[in-house]
């Protein structure tokens, strides 16, 4: 009987899990009435939002390089003269006066250029008002959207994708009866533009806007070609018409004159025509297959299945509304894979990084201009890149960093008299690096250093020494800036940033009368510690100048330690001025826990508890992207149930019907933060070991995952049951020792009890200073689960199976 029960349980588990393998679809029983109900398609360069209307189909279009303005700079040379006085005021505690001086001398009138829409392609169908049997979906396993419905007994279907293989958008429109397909195609563009017919294509030329005194010099040219089966294609001055066709394939090609952030001499029409001419050489079936193949090469690397009741027969918008009333693990998995889908669709090698809205934006001037906010948002976009097996999607960010390191040299020299390069809290297509938006938000010189963390993390995950060599100068340039910029605090004696802020926050809140401009915030100290340590370690690996390594180490030794304040919290500032009822969206001083690796529950338990107290004081409610961050932080806290509580908050008012994250409004970083957070709940490799299932919530009692990545070039497959690891298969790409951490005892060939320090260089973290602790508190320490640690000596290319004991 025992074995029969076990067999039945295994069968039920398999059936429950397998029900999610083929259900990675968003689907709806009505067209989109709002942009946040439309479905996103993208090939990294061309973005499309598909509304799925019956009478009128709207395809809202974006091209990743279509931004307002033209090459410009926003450095203010007055900053260098004002810098000594600003520092003097800060060190005297006159923060508001210092901030006012920064506003006067550090800013320009150029706060960044907005990412812009091209407009929409409108497809008008005749007499399709009274449609029935409506169905609309996005299949994220294929990156293909479709719409179907009936009118007067005739079934109409549309299928479209933004082709990774052919660099155009391709749409197939068909019907179940010959000759029943008639429609008109036109453009709706909110910008200065002209529409005409060119070479049997509907043609749009749109001009990007001027902005903040910077002339708009980018042009987008879009061509629409119809290839019909049956019927007739004709044109008026501004409309493409199809009459009585059996089916039609539309090819939509779009390009701009952008070449790089300094060069806009490209031929947008030549590029658009080139893409189009190549695409139409293939029939629809071939183009579709090649697109799916290219997309699947990335997406199919990782599979996640979690056991629960299957609600995939309900529309996605209804599942979102009901998420907190039941355990819909399938929706949690769909949302996880949707983040990977969005990253592939908005960030492929050779393109621009995903901006604040990825590549999807309906406005001339979007919220926050849909730029690159680098005091967390751009970084969060790329948190899932390595761990969820999409390392190639990181490449556009690395290319941007090269360009920012060039542009930021001038800013460092002109504004601060420093070597190296600097980036403040925002940038755009033109790689602006100066202070923007006002001192309260913009006087933060750490954006470049934080972004350099991604270079080091890519190396830790891939072991790619050629990559490290290529980008070493970018890291060194950022480190060089801080070697010059840091100043000795006259009271504490530490080397600190000044002026700076704790992102978008001040000790007295965020209002017009408060000041954020201070010296040596905890996040600054943590970021500077990382860039100096990572550059030091890269220098050693690449056999660079030993004297430079010594200089870096000397500066590291003079940085401020973290501090635990009077509320047993991790202090956000040098002074103990945190408020326990502070609910600000940024939790900047938690950087050292995530995405940093400076705070360990095992090596720094009191600090670990202080961060937990800070998280509890900040609360669980937040903007969409902040919720994404909190999922990761609570995963690092090894508290899967609290992480899941945050996930519930995400689905309660912070998720739009199309699964876009809601700040509100839409910001894509929250989607990526969620995906990274779920991965962090399943696998962690930051704390000198590979920790399997470190933060599994009660709701996810059984499941399996294949294709997660870990530092040291390891690939992890796992299955768990009853809330505990059942087995794991680990592939080693580079070889070397793998230290494995688990909450349950394990067994496996070659597995031995861990002793001493893990000598695998990919798992060696820099040692931080002991924290300074307020004399007003009684020390608090976390209650941790018992852990079992093992070492496994691996060989390159080999796989290892581990099971629970």
What residues fall within each predicted segment?
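Non-catalytic carbohydrate-binding regions of carbohydrate-active enzymes
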Residues: 457-458, 462, 466-467, 478-488, ...
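Alpha-helix capping and helix-loop boundary segments enriched in small/acidic/polar residues
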Residues: 326, 368-372, 385, 435-446, ...
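Bacterial N-terminal signal peptides that target proteins for export
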Residues: 1-9
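Hydrophobic h-region of N-terminal signal peptides that target proteins for export
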Residues: 12-20
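Acidic/histidine-rich catalytic neighborhood
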Residues: 477, 481-538
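Well-ordered alpha-helical segments within folded domains of soluble proteins
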Residues: 376-386, 445-456, 523-533, 588-597, ...
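Aromatic-residue-lined binding/catalytic grooves and analogous aromatic/hydrophobic interfacial grooves
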Residues: 22-440, 455-459, 512, 533, ...
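Conserved catalytic-core segments centered on acid/base and nucleophilic motifs
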Residues: 331-335, 341-344, 450-487
């Amino acid at each position: 009987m025992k074995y029969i029960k076990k067999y039945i349980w295994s069968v039920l588990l398999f059936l429950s899990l397998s029900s999610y393998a083929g259900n990675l679809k968003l689907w709806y029983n009505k067209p989109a009435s709002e942009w946040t109900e439309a479905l996103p398609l993208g090939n990294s360069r061309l973005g499309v939002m598909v509304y799925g209307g019956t009478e009128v189909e709207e395809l809202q279009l974006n091209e990743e390089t279509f931004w307002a303005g033209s090459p410009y700079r926003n450095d203010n040379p007055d900053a260098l003269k004002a810098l000594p006085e600003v520092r003097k005021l800060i060190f005297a505690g006159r923060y508001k006066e210092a901030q006012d001086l920064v506003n006067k001398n550090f800013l320009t009138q150029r706060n960044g250029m907005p990412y812009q829409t091209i407009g929409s392609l409108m497809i008008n169908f005749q007499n399709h008002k009274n449609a029935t049997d409506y169905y609309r979906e996005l299949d994220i396993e294929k990156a293909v959207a479709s719409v179907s419905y009936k009118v007067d007994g005739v079934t109409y279907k549309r299928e479209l994708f933004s082709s990774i293989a052919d660099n155009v958008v391709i749409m197939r429109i068909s019907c179940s009866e010959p000759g029943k397909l008639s429609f008109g195609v036109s453009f709706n563009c909110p910008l200065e533009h002209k529409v005409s017919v060119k070479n049997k294509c509907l043609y749009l030329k749109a001009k990007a806007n001027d902005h903040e005194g910077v002339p708009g010099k980018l042009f987008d040219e879009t061509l629409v070609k119809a290839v019909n089966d049956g019927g007739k294609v004709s044109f008026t001055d501004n409309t493409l018409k199809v009459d009585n066709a059996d089916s039609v394939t539309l090819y939509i090609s779009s390009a701009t004159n952008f070449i790089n952030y300094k060069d806009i001499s490209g031929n947008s029409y030549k590029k658009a025509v080139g893409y189009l001419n190549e695409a139409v050489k293939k029939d629809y079936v071939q183009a579709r297959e090649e697109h799916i193949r290219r997309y699947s090469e990335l997406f199919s690397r990782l599979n996640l299945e979690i056991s629960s009741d299957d609600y995939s027969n309900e529309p996605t918008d209804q599942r979102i509304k009901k998420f907190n009333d039941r355990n819909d693990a399938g929706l949690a998995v769909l949302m996880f894979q949707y983040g990977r889908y969005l990253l592939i669709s908005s960030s492929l090698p050779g393109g621009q990084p995903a901006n604040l809205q990825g590549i999807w934006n309906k406005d001339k001037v979007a919220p926050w201009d849909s730029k690159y906010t680098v005091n967390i948002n751009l970084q969060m976009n790329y948190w899932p890149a390595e761990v969820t097996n999409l390392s190639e999607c990181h490449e556009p960010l690395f290319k941007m960093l090269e360009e920012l390191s060039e542009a930021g040299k001038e800013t460092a020299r002109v504004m601060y008299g420093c070597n190296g390069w600097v980036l403040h809290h925002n940038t755009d297509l033109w790689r602006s690096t100066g202070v923007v938006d006002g001192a309260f938000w913009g006087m933060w010189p750490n954006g470049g250093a934080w972004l350099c963390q991604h270079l080091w993390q890519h190396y830790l995950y891939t072991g790619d020494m050629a990559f490290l060599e290529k980008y070493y100068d970018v890291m060194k340039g950022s480190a060089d800036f801080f070697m010059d910029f840091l100043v000795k605090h006259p009271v504490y004696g530490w080397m600190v940033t000044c002026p700076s802020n704790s992102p978008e926050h001040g000790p007295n809140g965020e209002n017009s009368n408060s000041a954020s401009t201070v010296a040596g915030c905890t996040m600054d100290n943590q970021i500077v510690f990382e860039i100096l340590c990572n550059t030091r370690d890269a220098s050693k690996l690449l056999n660079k100048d030993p004297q430079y390594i010594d200089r870096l180490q000397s500066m590291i030794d003079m940085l401020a330690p973290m501090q635990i304040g009077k509320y047993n919290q991790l202090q956000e500032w040098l002074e103990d001025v945190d408020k326990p009822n502070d609910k600000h969206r940024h939790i900047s001083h938690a950087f050292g826990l995530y995405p940093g690796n400076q705070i360990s529950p095992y090596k720094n338990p009191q600090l670990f508890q202080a961060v937990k107290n800070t998280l509890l004081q900040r609360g669980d409610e937040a903007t969409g992207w902040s919720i994404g961050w909190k999922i990761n932080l609570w995963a690092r806290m090894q508290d899967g149930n609290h992480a899941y509580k945050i996930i519930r908050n995400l689905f309660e008012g912070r998720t739009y019907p199309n699964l876009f994250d809601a700040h509100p409004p839409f910001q894509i970083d929250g989607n990526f933060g969620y995906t990274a957070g779920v991965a962090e709940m399943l696998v962690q490799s930051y704390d000198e070991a590979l920790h399997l299932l470190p933060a599994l919530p009660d709701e996810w009692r059984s499941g399996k995952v294949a294709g997660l990545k870990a530092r040291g070039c390891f690939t992890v497959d796992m299955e768990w049951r009853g809330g505990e690891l059942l087995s794991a298969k680990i592939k080693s790409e580079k070889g070397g020792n793998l230290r494995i951490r688990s909450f349950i005892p394990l067994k496996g060939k070659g597995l031995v009890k861990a002793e001493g320090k893990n000598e695998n260089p990919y798992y060696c973290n820099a040692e931080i200073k002991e924290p300074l602790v307020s004399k007003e508190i009684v020390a608090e320490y976390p209650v941790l689960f018992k852990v079992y640690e093992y070492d496994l000596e691996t060989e390159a290319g080999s796989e290892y199976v581990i099971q629970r004991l």
